[in-house]
Amino acid sequence: MGFRDLNLRERQVLGIIIQAYVVTAAPVGSRYIARNYNLGFSDATIRNVMAELEDEGYISQPHTSAGRIPTDKGYRYYVDLIMTFQSLDDNEKKRIEENIGQISIDRKGTSSDVLLSAVKVLGTISRQLSVVLSPTLSNAIFEKLDMVLLSSTRMMVILSIQSLFVKTIVMELDLEVSRQTIDGVVDMLNQRLSGLTLAEIRRSITRRLSGCSCDSGLKNLIVRSAGTLFDESPIFERLYISGTEYIVDQPEFKQPDKVRELITMIEDKFSMAKLVENSGPSRMDITISIGKENCERQAEDLTIVSAPYYVGNMVGKLGILGPKRMDYEHAVRVLNYMADSLSTTLSGVN
C-alpha cells in the first residue's frame, strides 16, 4: 500500500482520530479535536486537513455521522509511520511472569501447561481474542521415544522433544509383538536417533536403522511410518485460544449476524491457526495484518497482531485478534514482552 509523506498537521490529525476512535468507538469530528487537543490551529484548518485525508482514503465518513473514522489505509499509515513503542507497565509484566514463569520454577508443568497459561494471560491483559501456536517441530531436537501397547493390534508412540514438547500417535499393528520386542526396538531407536532433528530423522531413518538386530517387522513399520511419526503435528492441534468473551463484547460485533460470523470463524481452528501463521506485513518481529490484508474473508473487519517466540531452534507464534479499532501500541507492548517471557520460560523447562 503506497503512501505519500503526510505533513505534520496531517499526521497529527490522523493520529488523533485513530486514538480517539479506539477509545470512544464513535466518529471523530473537527470540533472534538479542536476542543480536546491544543494543536495551535483553528477548527476550519482541522476541517481542511480532514477533507484532504478523506480525499486520499485515510479516513471516511459513516452515513449517519458528521465525524470521520479511520480506513484500513489510515490504520496502516498509523501503524507504519506514526505509532511509537513504549515498555509494558510493571503490573502487567508481573502478571505475565506470575502466570507462565511459575511453571518453569516448579518444574511441574509441560509445554502445553505453559502455552495454556500464556494464552489465558494474553487474553486477560489485551482484552482481546488471543491465540498461541506451539512451535513447528521440523527443527526440534528428538530426545526419546516410548511405545505403549493399547491392544494386540494398536500401539501408542510417544515422542519426547526438547523443552518438554510431546507428540503422541496411535498406530495400527499388522503383527503381534511382545513387550520385550517393543523394548528392544525402543532402545535401538533412542540410541540411533536421539539428538537429531525431526527433519533429519525423516530424511535418514532408513540408513540409520540399517543393520540393527532388533525385530525387523516392528522396525520396518516405524520406517514406513516415519513421515507421520516425525512430521509436524496438524496446525489446528498446535492452536490455543482464549478471550472470546472480550471480542464478542466489542461494539463492532453487537449485530447478531456479525457475532455469528465471528463465532463460526473462531470455531474453525484450522482457519484460525492459518490466520495467525500467515498474518501480513511485518515491522521488526511484530506482524500487524489489518482488515482486507487478512487471508480470510471473515477476518476483513479484524486486525491481527502477532509475534514469534523461540525455543532453541523452534519457532512458535503469539497473536491478538480484535477489531481494527484496536489499541495498537498496547497490543505490541504486550506481545513483545509475552514473546520474550515465553521464550525464556520454555527454554528453561528442559
UniProtKB/Swiss-Prot annotation:
HAMAP family tied to this protein: HrcA
UniProt xrefs under InterPro entries: GAF-like_dom_sf, HrcA, HrcA_C, WH-like_DNA-bd_sf, WH_DNA-bd_sf, WHTH_transcript_rep_HrcA_IDD
Gene (UniProt): hrcA
Protein's name according to its UniProt entry: Heat-inducible transcription repressor HrcA
Keywords: Repressor, Stress response, Transcription, Transcription regulation
Protein role: Negative regulator of class I heat shock genes (grpE-dnaK-dnaJ and groELS operons). Prevents heat-shock induction of these operons.
Annotated family: Belongs to the HrcA family.
GO BP terms: negative regulation of DNA-templated transcription
Bilayer-spanning residue ranges: none
GO MF annotation list: DNA binding
Pfam families, per database record: HrcA
Superkingdom, natural source: Bacteria
Annotated signal peptide: none
